């Protein structure tokens, strides 16, 4: 959805029934963080009038059955998880000469004279929402440098899963091994830093220099530099929003049929966090440069109702990728979101979804995160050759 401030959202299925979404309340603080959104709690209700806050980019896949299979666009946080994240969230370090590494490091060389773009202090039309920049805390199940937010009833043993190899075999033989695509192709970012976000500004764009396609381009470059075959499919799937996951599924299947060597599919998204009074910008500093925090999502199908029987194989890849991202910088990656949903991750045993920043991160920050993620992905895949 384009705006956060709607109290009630009406969603129509093919049968025309109107359903309400119930979500959690917004936690308000009076200190560094004005508020942190409680993410969307996916519940289909009838005859109830619960206050609803929606996340930008929400999409209902076509039909109620698909809703149960794919879930909603954004996963949710429980009240206790939000409270803990807010209590442990930290401010983003200032960028100074001392924060810039003196050695060539992952994603950026010190020889690069990085200069961030000038901030935009323009006062736009509409309601102004202060942008709260923070590092989202690693809250959840922990093992070494891996943190998982487990929203399922599965008793996850991270160490045990790491002991099993993913069902992915990578070859550097010139054939496509990875497919990068975007279910919500229009999810976009800010051109430059802003103190406030305005209700008149768009959170979606067809400009490939400002939306998630730009992030996919950075990941693609890293894979190509490493000699790993990759296809970056930029098909628009979210116009209209309804049925986007159905259309991206068709794109995946077309690419798999044309290129059966593909082992891994990555659905690159942009997240959205905030409430009635603020927008959250998850950011960290790596090698003296701001990067948007990212989040990997891996699905679960405990009762077999989602048609995702091999979810554990996908999780094993996700955990290794999470670990390699954390090896770059612990604050680079938010907790892995292990959730009761499918999101087209049943396409292959190496299918995952990754969220880059939010709508108030800059395109510069998320492109840098795409480079860093690309490095972690290369390292993960090269270990599976």
Question: Where are the language model's segments positioned?
Answer:
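N-terminal catalytic or cofactor-binding beta/alpha core of small enzyme domains
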Residues: 26-261, 272-275, 371, 382-385
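Loop/turn elements at helix/coil->beta-strand transitions in domains of secreted/extracellular proteins
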Residues: 225-229, 260-264, 292-293, 331, ...
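Alpha-helical scaffolding within the catalytic cores
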Residues: 252, 277-284, 336-342
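Solvent-exposed loop/turn segments at secondary-structure junctions
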Residues: 185-188, 236-241, 270-275, 301-304, ...
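Active-site-adjacent substrate-binding region
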Residues: 310-337
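N-terminal Lys/Arg-rich, disordered targeting/topogenic segments
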Residues: 1-19
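Active-site-adjacent mobile loop/cap segments within catalytic or ligand-binding domains
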Residues: 332-385
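Active-site microenvironments of hydrolase-like enzyme catalytic domains
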Residues: 183, 192, 258-301
């Amino acid at each position: 959805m384009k705006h956060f401030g709607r109290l009630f959202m009406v969603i129509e299925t093919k049968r025309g029934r109107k359903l309400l979404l119930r979500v959690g309340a917004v936690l308000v603080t009076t200190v560094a963080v004005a508020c942190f959104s409680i993410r969307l709690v996916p519940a289909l209700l009838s005859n109830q009038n619960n206050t609803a806050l929606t996340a930008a980019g929400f999409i209902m896949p076509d039909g109620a059955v698909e809703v149960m299979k794919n879930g909603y666009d954004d996963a949710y946080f429980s009240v206790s998880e939000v409270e803990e994240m807010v209590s442990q969230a930290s401010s983003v370090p200032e960028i100074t000469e001392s924060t810039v590494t003196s050695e060539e490091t992952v994603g950026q060389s010190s020889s690069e004279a990085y200069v961030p773009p000038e901030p935009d202090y323009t006062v736009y039309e509409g309601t102004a929402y202060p942008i709260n920049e923070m590092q989202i805390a690693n809250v959840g199940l922990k093992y070494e440098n891996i943190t998982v937010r487990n929203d399922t009833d599965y008793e996850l043993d991270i160490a045990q899963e790491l002991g099993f190899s993913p069902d992915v075999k990578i070859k550097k033989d010139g054939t496509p091994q990875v497919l990068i695509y975007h279910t919500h192709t229009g999810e976009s970012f800010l051109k430059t830093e802003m103190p406030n976000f305005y209700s008149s500004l768009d959170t979606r764009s067809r400009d490939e220099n400002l939306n998630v396609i730009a992030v996919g381009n950075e990941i693609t470059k890293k894979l190509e530099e490493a000699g790993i075959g990759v296809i970056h499919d930029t098909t628009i799937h979210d116009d209209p929003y309804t049925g986007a996951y159905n259309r991206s599924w068709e794109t995946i299947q077309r690419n798999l049929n044309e290129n059966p060597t593909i082992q891994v599919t990555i659905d690159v998204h942009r997240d959205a966090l905030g409430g009635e009074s603020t927008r959250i910008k998850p950011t960290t500093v790596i090698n003296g440069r701001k990067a948007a925090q990212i989040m990997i999502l891996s699905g679960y199908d405990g009762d077999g109702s989602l048609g995702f029987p091999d979810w554990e194989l996908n999780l094993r890849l996700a955990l290794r990728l999470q670990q390699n991202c954390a090896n770059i910088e612990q604050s680079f990656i938010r907790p892995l979101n292990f959730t009761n949903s499918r999101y087209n991750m049943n396409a292959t045993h190496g299918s995952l979804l990754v969220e880059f920043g939010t709508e108030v991160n800059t395109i510069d920050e998320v492109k840098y995160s795409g480079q860093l993620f690309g490095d972690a992905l290369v390292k993960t895949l090269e270990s599976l050759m």
